[in-house]
C-alpha cells in the first residue's frame, strides 16, 4: 500500500488501542495490542507519518533509530544487588532502566501526555548482540526488565532485504505477534505532501514528466545507485536556499542528493530549461493578465514537455499565493478566537483591560511552549502562534476593546483583499490557459493539480471561481466516462471468458 493508506491504518490502530470502556480500561488489553511493523524502502516518509499521527491524535512520540544503540543502552547497565532467598543471602544481577524506556518517562514528564507512540526505526537491521533484545521487545513489549509504560503503542519500521544487507529476518513466532504493514513509494501520494511542505516547483514539474525517476534503486558494478523521496525533498530545500544566495545548482550538486547519475543529469538539464521558460514566458505578466500573441503561438507549436512545464510554472506561482492566503486566513481565525475570549473576560466584574490582556498573552505563551515541548506543533503552526502573540502584544498599547476591535477589523480587511487578489490571479491563469490550449490535456493537468493541493482546495471551497467549476466539471465527466468504459471492458472480458469456457 502507499504511505498515505499506511498512515491511516496506523492512526486507526492507535485510536483502537487507546479506546477505553466505561471502567476506564483499554478495550483491547495491552497484551493483545500487537506492535505495528511498517516495512518499506528507505526515504519514503515513515518517520514523518509518525510525527503527523502523534499530532493528529494529540499523543506523545518518542522516536529512536535502534542501529544507533548498543545492547547496554537498550536494556540498561548491569549492577549487583543483594537478595535473600529461603533465608540465605545471594548476589544477583539487576539492570538499570533502559535508555529508551527512560526517554518515554521523560517525555511523559515534559509533555504531561500519558499516552503516545514509541517508534523504533531500522528494527530489522540490529547487530547480532541486539537481535534477541528486539525479539523480546516485539514479543513482550519490554527492554531488559522494564516494560513499555501502559498507554504507549509500539510502532517499528524496517527495510526489506533488497535495500539493506544488514537485514535480519524475523521468525514466524515473532511475525505472529505483530501487525505488519508493507508500504511502497507512490509519487501521486507524495505529491500531496510535497505541496503542503512547499517542495520546489521545478522538482514537482520534473516528476510530473518523469514519474519513473521518483524512486529508483539499482545494483551496478560500482555499487547501489538510488533516488529516494527524501533525496528529492532535501534537494528541493537546497535549491530554494541557493536561489536566495544566487548560487548555481548544477549536475554535480544534484548528484550529491540524487545518487543515480542518469537521473541527476536529467534533472539538472531540466532545471536549466525550467529557468529558461520562467524568464522567456514572462509569468508575472501572465498572472497579472497580460500576455502577447507571440507567447500563445509559441506554446501551440511547443513540445508537450515544454507546455506542461509552463502549466506547472503557473501553478507553482499560484501555489505560493494559495498558501499565503491560507496562512492569512488561519492567522485571522486564530486571532479572532483569542479576541472573543478576551471580550468574554472583560465582561467579568472588576476586569481591567490591560491586566486581562497581559494574562491572556501569558496563558497563550505557556500553552504554546507546552505544545512545542510535546511536539504537537508544526513549524508553520509555531510561526502562526508567534505572529498571534506579537499582534496581541501590540494591542497592549491600547487595550480597550473598541481600539482592539478597530485594529482587528483592518486585519480582516487585508485578508479579504488578499483573497480577492488570489481569485483575480487564478482567473488570469485560466484565461491564459484557455487562450493557449482550450479544453485540452494541459488544462486537465492544471485542474488536476488544483484538486490535489490542500491550499488550493481550501481556497476554492471558500471562493467561487466560475472557470474552475467549468473545467473541473468537464474533467470529472471525462474521468467518469473512462471509468464506465473500463467497467464495460471488464464485463466484456468476463463474458468472453465465459463463452470460451462454454
Residue ranges and their predicted role:
Residues 1-212, 217-220:
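AAA+ P-loop NTPase catalytic core and its hallmark functional loops
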Residues 2-9, 36, 171, 186-189, ...:
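General structural signal for secondary-structure boundaries
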Residues 8, 12, 16, 55, ...:
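Charged/polar, solvent-exposed surface patches and flexible loops
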Residues 35-37, 57-67, 80, 89-116, ...:
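Conformational switch/transducer regions in large eukaryotic molecular machines and scaffolds
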Residues 196-354:
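Alpha-helical lid/collar subdomain of P-loop NTPases
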Residues 300-502:
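Terminal-proximal interaction/regulatory segments of ATP-powered molecular machines
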Amino acid at each position: 500500500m502507499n504511505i498515505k493508506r499506511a498512515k491511516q491504518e496506523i492512526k486507526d490502530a492507535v485510536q483502537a488501542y487507546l479506546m477505553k470502556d466505561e471502567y476506564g480500561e483499554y478495550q483491547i488489553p495491552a497484551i493483545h495490542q500487537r506492535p505495528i511493523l511498517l516495512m518499506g524502502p528507505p526515504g519514503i516518509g515513515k518517520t514523518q507519518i509518525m510525527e503527523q499521527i502523534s499530532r493528529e491524535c494529540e499523543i506523545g512520540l518518542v522516536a529512536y533509530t535502534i542501529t544507533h544503540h548498543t545492547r547496554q543502552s537498550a536494556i540498561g547497565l548491569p549492577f549487583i544487588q543483594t537478595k535473600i532467598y529461603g533465608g540465605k543471602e545471594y548476589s544477583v544481577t539487576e539492570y538499570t532502566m533502559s535508555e529508551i524506556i527512560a526517554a518515554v518517562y521523560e517525555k511523559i514528564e515534559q509533555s504531561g501526555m500519558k499516552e503516545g507512540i514509541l517508534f523504533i526505526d531500522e528494527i530489522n537491521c540490529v547487530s547480532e548482540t541486539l537481535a534477541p533484545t528486539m525479539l523480546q521487545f516485539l514479543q513482550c513489549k519490554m527492554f531488559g526488565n522494564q516494560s513499555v509504560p501502559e498507554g504507549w503503542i509500539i510502532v517499528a519500521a524496517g527495510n526489506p532485504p533488497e535495500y539493506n544487507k544488514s537485514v535480519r529476518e524475523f521468525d514466524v513466532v515473532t511475525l505472529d505477534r505483530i501487525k505488519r504493514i508493507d508500504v511502497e513509494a507512490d509519487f501521486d501520494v507524495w505529491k500531496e505532501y510535497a505541496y503542503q511542505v512547499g517542495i520546489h516547483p521545478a522538482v514537482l514539474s520534473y516528476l510530473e514528466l518523469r514519474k519513473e525517476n521518483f524512486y529508483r534503486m539499482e545494483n551496478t558494478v560500482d555499487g547501489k545507485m538510488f533516488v529516494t523521496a527524501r533525496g528529492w525533498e532535501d534537494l528541493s530545500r537546497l535549491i530554494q536556499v541557493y536561489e536566495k544566495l544566487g548560487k548555481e545548482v548544477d549536475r554535480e550538486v544534484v548528484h550529491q542528493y540524487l545518487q543515480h547519475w542518469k537521473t541527476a543529469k536529467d534533472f539538472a538539464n531540466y532545471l536549466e530549461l525550467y529557468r529558461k521558460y520562467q524568464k522567456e514566458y514572462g509569468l508575472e505578466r501572465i498572472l497579472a493578465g497580460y500576455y502577447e500573441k507571440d507567447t500563445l503561438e509559441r506554446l501551440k507549436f511547443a513540445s508537450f514537455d515544454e507546455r506542461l512545464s509552463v502549466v506547472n510554472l503557473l501553478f507553482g506561482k499560484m501555489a505560493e499565493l494559495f498558501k499565503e492566503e491560507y496562512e492569512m486566513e488561519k492567522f485571522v481565525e486564530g486571532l479572532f478566537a483569542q479576541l472573543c475570549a478576551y471580550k468574554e473576560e472583560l465582561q467579568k466584574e472588576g476586569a481591567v483591560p490591560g491586566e486581562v490582556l497581559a494574562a491572556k498573552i501569558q496563558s497563550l505563551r505557556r500553552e504554546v511552549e507546552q505544545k512545542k515541548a510535546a511536539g504537537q506543533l508544526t513549524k508553520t503552526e509555531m510561526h502562526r502562534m508567534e505572529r498571534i502573540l506579537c499582534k496581541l502584544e501590540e494591542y497592549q498599547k491600547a487595550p480597550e476593546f473598541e481600539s482592539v476591535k478597530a485594529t482587528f477589523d483592518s486585519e480582516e480587511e487585508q485578508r479579504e483583499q488578499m483573497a480577492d487578489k488570489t481569485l483575480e490571479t487564478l482567473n488570469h491563469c485560466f484565461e491564459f490557459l484557455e487562450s493557449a490550449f482550450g479544453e485540452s490535456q494541459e488544462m486537465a493537468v492544471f485542474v488536476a493539480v488544483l484538486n490535489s493541493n490542500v491550499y488550493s482546495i481550501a481556497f476554492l471551497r471558500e471562493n467561487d471561481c466560475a472557470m474552475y467549476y467549468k473545467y473541473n466539471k468537464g474533467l470529472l465527466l471525462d474521468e467518469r466516462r473512462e471509468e464506465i468504459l473500463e467497467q464495460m471492458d471488464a464485463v466484456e472480458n468476463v463474458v468472453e471468458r465465459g463463452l470460451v469456457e462454454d
